[in-house]
């Protein structure tokens, strides 16, 4: 149990360093782009499924 606490503490510290250091901003921009790409792919998939029937 103590091992999990230490692991989560280390992960939290690393996340804080990335979050406060500005590294997360670049990752967030990439995540937004990927989100919109997959949203468009979802809409295309749903529409093609509807028109196929």
Swiss-Prot record:
Organism of origin: Christiangramia forsetii (strain DSM 17595 / CGMCC 1.15422 / KT0803) (Gramella forsetii)
Chain ranges passing through the membrane: 4-24, 27-47
Gene Ontology CC annotation, any one: plasma membrane
Entries under Pfam families matching the protein: DUF1328
Domain of life: Bacteria
UniProt-recorded name of the protein: UPF0391 membrane protein GFO_1615
Localization: Cell membrane
Keywords recorded for this protein, A-Z: Cell membrane, Membrane, Transmembrane, Transmembrane helix
Family matches, as InterPro entries: DUF1328
Membrane topology label: Multi-pass membrane protein
Family (UniProt): Belongs to the UPF0391 family.
Region forming the signal peptide: none
């Amino acid at each position: 149990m103590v091992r999990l606490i230490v692991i989560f503490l280390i992960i939290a510290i690393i996340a804080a360093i990335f979050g406060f250091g500005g590294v997360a901003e670049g990752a967030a921009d990439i995540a937004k782009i990927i989100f919109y790409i997959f949203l468009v792919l979802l809409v295309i998939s749903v529409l093609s499924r509807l028109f196929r029937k």
